[in-house]
């Protein structure tokens, strides 16, 4: 492969074409996708950060993230964006620092102004649609990165992953479990 994992994570782009997916991934899974151009858009919300050990990747999803998404959808009463960036932690080996911004298109909730904003950067993105249980979502995300992007010859460029959660996610139920409905955008070259 020609580069160590730490330097790979620090690169401006991630070329996953030469990686072999783990045995537990179903690379025959097909997800609806399209290549699109996004325009810049300002969203308003709040920032969170956490760390995850690289040996917990890619099977482990943050339970805190799901709680935040569910509560934000319920409280704000509208669709929610989650912009996430990933980079090696500067102080610890084998740790990824994850920064997420949760936001919406309006700058106020219940009459109160939201002071923090972030701009979704314009550019080329691979857009995927997911509807299913949150437990299935991690498999979806892993399959996109480890199987679908390489199969399509797409290289992830620097930028934030964008998840756009639909309000209906809070209301949909199947077997007493919430169904997640979202679009997932990955910045690509």
Label the predicted regions.
Residues 1-189:
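A solvent-exposed interaction/effector surface
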